[in-house]
Every structure is written in C-alpha cells, then in structure tokens.
C-alpha cells in the first residue's frame, strides 16, 4: 500500500511518482506494478550520492555527495528535495548544472532526498 512521500518508478518507461496521499490500491504503469524506490543512506562509491546538508543564513544548502556528483547527459541528479515541518520543497536539475540546491526556509530538523538517474534515491537527515 503506497504511503505519503514514497517514491515509485516504472521499470518499463521510467515514470517516477511521489505519493502525495497514500491509499489502499497499487500503483501501476505500463500494465506492471511500479517499484518502490528505497532511500539509500550509505554510499560505497566514494560518497557521491548521499546528500550533504549545510545550514546557511536563512535556510539550507543541499549538495549531492561529499565529492560533487557528475552532471552529464547520461548520468546526473534529476532532483533534490527538502522535507521540513510537514512541507516538501523540490528543486529540479538538468545536466550541466551544479548538483546542489538552496532552500530558504527555517526549520530545526530537515531531511534531504535526491534522485540520481542511474543510482536511484538517496537520503540524509540533519
């Protein structure tokens, strides 16, 4: 059963869906159940995927990886998301852009999530 803020992917066409309101049904695309994307938190590949959260004046800066993640046509971060105080903030990225986002919000505790088009869904908490 899908739950709020879970991320699902279609293994056939690549559609990605974030659940806004969980229900009792299954998520289906291209006549197949969509796959729940697990949130990875440990990166064995030299820490290029785990979000790094930095408190800045007036908000938070999220960088993808302790070592900057590639942002090439075939391998890049599609989006960075910040969850805070029951709100969700998303910055969509394109190849060539820096793998980072600034969110000008005040919150004591935040969760950063990002999605790599090849290596999937990653998460970190402050």
UniProtKB/Swiss-Prot annotation:
Q: What positions does the entry give for Fe cation 1 binding?
A: 10, 13, 29-30
Q: Which reaction does it catalyse?
A: reduced [rubredoxin] + superoxide + 2 H(+) = oxidized [rubredoxin] + H2O2
Cofactor(s) this protein requires = Fe(3+); Cu(2+)
| Biological process terms in GO annotation | removal of superoxide radicals
Gene Ontology molecular-function annotations: iron ion binding; superoxide reductase activity
Under InterPro entries, the record lists: Desulfoferrodoxin_Fe-bd_dom (IPR002742), Desulfoferrodoxin_Fe-bd_dom_sf (IPR036073), Desulfoferrodoxin_N (IPR004462), Desulfoferrodoxin_N_sf (IPR038094), Desulfoferrodoxin_rbo (IPR004793), Desulfoferrodoxin_SOR (IPR051233)
Could you say which protein family the record assigns here? Belongs to the desulfoferrodoxin family.
Q: How does it assemble?
A: Homodimer.
* Job of this protein: Catalyzes the one-electron reduction of superoxide anion radical to hydrogen peroxide at a nonheme ferrous iron center. Plays a fundamental role in case of oxidative stress via its superoxide detoxification activity.
In the UniProt entry for this protein, what further remark is given in the free-text comments? Answer: Catalysis occurs at center II. Fe(2+) ion of center II is the electron donor and is converted to the Fe(3+) form during the reaction. The protein sequence in PubMed:10617593 comes from protein overexpressed and processed in E.coli.
For domains, the record's comment is: Is organized in two protein domains. The N-terminal domain has a fold similar to that of desulforedoxin and contains a mononuclear Fe(3+) ion, center I. The second domain contains a different mononuclear iron center, center II, with a Fe(2+) ion.
- Protein name per the record: Desulfoferrodoxin
Q: Which species?
A: Desulfarculus baarsii (strain ATCC 33931 / DSM 2075 / LMG 7858 / VKM B-1802 / 2st14)
